[in-house]
Amino acid sequence: MEKPNPRRPSNSVLPYETPRLRDHYLLGKKLGQGQFGTTYLCTEKSSSANYACKSIPKRKLVCREDYEDVWREIQIMHHLSEHPNVVRIKGTYEDSVFVHIVMEVCEGGELFDRIVSKGCFSEREAAKLIKTILGVVEACHSLGVMHRDLKPENFLFDSPSDDAKLKATDFGLSVFYKPGQYLYDVVGSPYYVAPEVLKKCYGPEIDVWSAGVILYILLSGVPPFWAETESGIFRQILQGKIDFKSDPWPTISEGAKDLIYKMLDRSPKKRISAHEALCHPWIVDEHAAPDKPLDPAVLSRLKQFSQMNKIKKMALRVIAERLSEEEIGGLKELFKMIDTDNSGTITFEELKAGLKRVGSELMESEIKSLMDAADIDNSGTIDYGEFLAATLHINKMEREENLVVAFSYFDKDGSGYITIDELQQACTEFGLCDTPLDDMIKEIDLDNDGKIDFSEFTAMMKKGDGVGRSRTMRNNLNFNIAEAFGVEDTSSTAKSDDSPK
């Protein structure tokens, strides 16, 4: 990597000047799209070696805290880069538009996807995987780093080979901490968040909880705390009992269940540490975890759970933009009140000022979470459709006449079915590139005829999934946009196309 110049330009993320990325790398295909940036394959000109380049648009960094978050992520990646199961950072670059993080490329796919594609899976394999994950957690904690967003999507295999290494890849929510220090901001992903995070007072023990949730899912195909809504999920996390009675748990070893119990203890003080978990007999003794394949139903559930339903997300946006004045209530006026420059979009500063005007005392990090959750297309602003989708009551969204409107949007030729070509067209319109359409169809296509009819579409829309791949929670127990502005549900069944003029 080029030696950085220690002079820091104004309005920059990095505390030093850097060479131009394109002087040293050729950018290739897009590998993935995240909440804050896009990852590309890149090739180093001097060596022809391939790397991954995460490019973060600076327009999405709307406050000084965002700049500090990116710089902290880079520092933490350097801090952990010698660990064999952490993606190694190669270098950082910055120009007037982007911050680029060049790192080791992982071409073996996500944790759950690899398991599903293998077609069989055993307790012993689960023990090896969770040992790797706990090893990363132990390393983080020993170096004074709290991850705060452990989930399967943040673990990739470095190659497609059978002996590929599992590597932690995303440290965007990670922070440095001191022993005995507590944090208070609500971050993470719904299924994996620890109860003390929801109570807004927590320490590094939250990472062990998240790893325990991953282990439960590895062995059963479903999360331990489940509900139709995110607020329901959080209630289960705070109060629910762990289910070890349903299939496949009667066939799972007592050692596995004992470790999960200890990792999912609601008391952080009683919860097992990462080091103690690594010393648990189920992990240490290679014969304690049986090598026989788990029930195939586990893999089936795992596949369903690991796929975010993008069609549902698009459909909610379509419905939100077609509701009537009466059904929308005062939301149009609220949008116009927040959008002070009448640009048709809400920026972070406008959202913050709007919340202040209605007497909200949310912290800046919480407002940023609201912004991220509502920004469906990752543009860095909230347009009118996104605002409605974030603030309207779900009962309005699920009314049949609104579902008909949404279905018709996808069913371009009016055949009564959504085909893969029509889905491709919709994805293009929504800017969802490189989306596995076959998997999206199969997820909803109950009769396996290769297309989606209205009854299948309706079942999908009314099914609670709660799966979120964003770095923040869409609706948590403490706040969402609707609650922040005091928006209440009103009853109406009319519909029409409307937008603020």
Curated annotation (Swiss-Prot):
Residues at which Ca(2+) 2 binds: D375, D377, S379, T381, E386
Pfam family, one: EF-hand_7
Binding-site residues for Ca(2+) 3, renumbered to this chain: D411, D413, S415, Y417, E422
Domain of life: Eukaryota
E.C. designation(s): 2.7.11.1
Subcellular location per the Swiss-Prot or TrEMBL entry: Cytoplasm; Nucleus
Residues the entry annotates as binding Ca(2+) 1: D339, D341, S343, T345, E350
GO biological process: positive regulation of abscisic acid-activated signaling pathway
GO (cellular component) term, any one: nucleus
SUPFAM superfamilies, sorted: EF-hand (SSF47473), Protein kinase-like (PK-like) (SSF56112)
Keyword annotations: ATP-binding, Calcium, Cytoplasm, Kinase, Metal-binding, Nucleotide-binding, Nucleus, Phosphoprotein, Repeat, Serine/threonine-protein kinase, Transferase
Region (Autoinhibitory domain): 289-319
Binding site for Ca(2+) 4: D445, D447, D449, K451, E456
Catalytic residues of the enzyme: D149 (proton acceptor)
Reaction catalysis annotation: L-seryl-[protein] + ATP = O-phospho-L-seryl-[protein] + ADP + H(+); L-threonyl-[protein] + ATP = O-phospho-L-threonyl-[protein] + ADP + H(+)
Residue intervals of the Protein kinase domain: 25-283
Role of this protein: May play a role in signal transduction pathways that involve calcium as a second messenger. Functions as a regulator of the calcium-mediated abscisic acid (ABA) signaling pathway. Phosphorylates ABA-responsive transcription factors ABF1 and ABF4 in vitro. Phosphorylates the nuclear zinc finger Di19 in vitro.
Subunit annotation: Interacts with Di19.
The protein's name: Calcium-dependent protein kinase 4
